Amino acid sequence: MFLRVYDLEAAKKVMKWRCNWCWNIWCRKYTLWGLLEIYELGGNPKYLEAAKRSAVQLIDMLRANNVRICDTGTFEGMPSMSILKPMLILYRNTGDKKFLDFSREIVGYLDRDDGTSPNLIRNSFSDKPVHEWYPKPEKWAKAYEMMSCMEGVLEYYRITGDKRCLEAVERFADKIWKFERNPLASVGYNDQFAHAASEINGITEPCDAIHWMRLNLDLYTLTGNPKY
């Protein structure tokens, strides 16, 4: 099992700092997504079966160890929870309720009454810009991972019709447009949401630019609103 860093002192011996990074489920997300893409392109059922087995193993492993996906990985669980979209694509291709139930669980962790970070859905309805949701945004406000989670929230709306999810992503996108656009036609500063629109210069990751484009394309496809 490799779900999170349990010993920060041991990690420090290797990394020279108390590193809590664990990208296992993030990497499994892209493995799952790749299997589903090649299945949808070519129709070979072995790739769908491999995707199913991978997802079942992950869900069962979390259950067996009594670990919530929001408590895995790093950056408040966002890299791990971004598996939401391919998990829903898998549900769409199989109809297996196990994958929808797991997706619903992830959405619940993003819309919590207790306010635990990152709480992306709930916070999108607040008046605060993203970088002010919690203290020390450098510890949690990762642009790519956050937008990838919200892409999954849109997929959840597409499959379930939950309009709260659509509205949350619309509000989130409005906040990013207002507070996080940078001079490079991307969003965020370096790899974080940090009120980039207030900076006179810019630095960005290509993945942030790509996911900002993806999020707007998805919103336009779902709403027809030309602003996206």
Regions of interest found by a model, annotated:
Residues 1-228:
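Glycan-recognition and catalytic cores of secretory/periplasmic carbohydrate-active enzymes
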